[in-house]
Amino acid sequence: NPMDMNFAVTETSKEVYDNLFCQVSSFPADDNPGKNVRFLIKETNTNTIAGFVRLGSPTINSAPRNKMLGNTPDLTALNRHFIMGFHIVPAQPFGFNYLGGKLLTMICCSHFTRRYLNKKYGVEICAFETTSLYGNIKGCSQYDGMKPYLRNVGLTDSKFLLTMADKWYAELNEWFINRNGGEHLIKKDASSRKLKTQTKMIAIIKASLRSQGRTTDLTDFNDFIKKAIGLNTQKLQYFSNYGFENVVDYVNGKTDALIKKPNYDNYELENAINWWKKKAQKRFDNLNADGRIRHEMEVWKSDNLEGIDIIR
């Protein structure tokens, strides 16, 4: 019964997180530059993992965010005040039976998480954002129905090349460094270094093919990049203000103090979990009445991939 459940949120190492996460998700467990916090969420009565959360520095390009703020934000302010949810993945069947994705999201939107990040990184987080998994190819998301804690603010711009997986990026980056006199293409202290390095790699490849007169290869390479960009669907972007009413003005530097909304205390972790419990109880009761409760744990194995009906 969800009303009897209790949860603990703990940060864990990359090694432990990745080893567990790959059992329940098809997502690559890549790092992103900047902040990285990996939470394991455990149900303490049963000592079982309910889900995984990885938070990190926000992406640079976001049309919905820019529209909401009224401009392209200063990167220093963006990194100081925004945090992004990269993994919000419930273990199954907890996610299906109890709306586990909503629980994990409420934890992300809680003051517990905000204060944790503030203490760890010496920042003043006042905004959380994440994007839907399936993009505009699917009309619903685990983040729907979470107002006022989380709101849809629009569709991300699809004209954007994703960064390479860590393994391939590391190998290619080493190749370029070796041929650049041991020097990195982008300075080590640069922001969004991985994205900038990848962009530089692409520019060098194009220039090299052009200078060697390899017109056909250049055309093929350009077509490949265009295709990679085209594979991206627009995704719904979601935003939480942690119960502050003047986040936009604060991030834009128009005020130096955050103002609490009347519902500010609702974002405390205990209250956030209680909000979820009511939703989860209704979900569980409906599934139970229909005989649709799931009992089997879903993990990724070579012999059961066809039996798992969703991609996380």
Roles of regions detected by a PLM:
Residues 1-11:
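Conserved N-terminal entry element of GNAT/NAT acetyltransferase domains
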Residues 14-17, 26, 35-37, 43-183, ...:
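Acyl-donor binding region in acyl/amide transferases
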Residues 21-23:
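Long, hydrophobic/aromatic-enriched structural stretches that serve as scaffold segments
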Residues 29-30:
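Short Gly/Pro-enriched turn/cap motifs at secondary-structure boundaries
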Residues 40, 174-312:
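Long, compositionally biased intrinsically disordered regions
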